[in-house]
Amino acid sequence: QEWSLPGTRVPPPADPEGGDANLRCVCVKTISGVSPKHISSLEVIGAGPHCPSPQLIATLKKGHKICLDPQNLLYKKIIKKLLKSQLLTA
């Protein structure tokens, strides 16, 4: 299955030497079981000094933002694909 969503983006990793004072996990609570058909865009924040695991933030079609469980098998595939595509375009 193809998981390219129109609003998908992978921001660059946080630069610890850049003085980013907001170095912490964005996703404290995650949800699994959200169907991709309800998602309008995705944002992947890779693991780094700010957070030990990747974070997957979904914007639902109704406008709500939620954090998806990065350990969910389906979401792991999405994260892997998005991070791979970022490396290819960098």
Swiss-Prot record:
Phosphoserine: residues bearing it: 41
Keyword entries, A-Z: Chemotaxis, Cytokine, Disulfide bond, Glycoprotein, Heparin-binding, Phosphoprotein, Pyrrolidone carboxylic acid, Secreted
Chief subcellular location: secreted
A biological-process GO annotation: negative regulation of angiogenesis
Coiled coil listed as a keyword: no
Ranges where the record places region Disordered: 1-20
Pfam families in alphabetical order: IL8
CDD domains: Chemokine_CXC
Family named by the database record: Belongs to the intercrine alpha (chemokine CxC) family.
Function: Chemokine released during platelet aggregation that plays a role in different biological processes including hematopoiesis, cell proliferation, differentiation, and activation. Acts via different functional receptors including CCR1, CXCR3A or CXCR3B. Upon interaction with CXCR3A receptor, induces activated T-lymphocytes migration mediated via downstream Ras/extracellular signal-regulated kinase (ERK) signaling. Neutralizes the anticoagulant effect of heparin by binding more strongly to heparin than to the chondroitin-4-sulfate chains of the carrier molecule.
PANTHER family in alphabetical order: PLATELET FACTOR 4, SMALL INDUCIBLE CYTOKINE A
Quaternary structure and partners: Homotetramer. Interacts with TNFAIP6 (via Link domain). Interacts with CCR1. Interacts with CXCR3. Interacts with THBD; this interaction enhances generation of activated protein C.
Name assigned to this protein: Platelet factor 4
Provenance organism: Sus scrofa (Pig)
